[in-house]
């Protein structure tokens, strides 16, 4: 619970300081979703997924029937109401990984097949409910969950089965959450440092400098053995 509260507070305070607004960013979404889905972690995995699917369905019905599209679209990440939708991603990932971790041997093929099937289900459902990131539609959530599961499986094959090690990714993974939080700070410094008279390449420069700054922080943390947990 502490981690989710801290994520929400980091996001809330950071947005207030950086943008002087009460917008709903990624960190607020992560914190609120974690707190909302916390009770689901105390029930069997299958029940947890079913409950999160029910939550996702309720959100989509409310979105379509109660005229909430404009309200939700006004926030980044869908705002507080979209917590009902994001809950499925967290519940599914925690439940599926939790079940496999308890086994002596993890079967990555199940994750890969499951990811492809879920992504396909999300794609097919988009013909009924269009994929919409701003509204955090159910098709978007299901499709994204499938893609994330597939990517996780491929990474597992590459690292755990194939034995590949990529130093930069390893460093980023060891402090992924704190690096993500600090990325907004790095981005702010980059925007101040770069000249404003480069309209064409400005977004590219910001992206490259921010990415480079985050990688540099991750490498420094890894070399000094610093691992920050929330």
Say what each PLM segment does:
Residues 1-230:
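Alpha-helical transmembrane segments and their immediate juxtamembrane cytosolic regions
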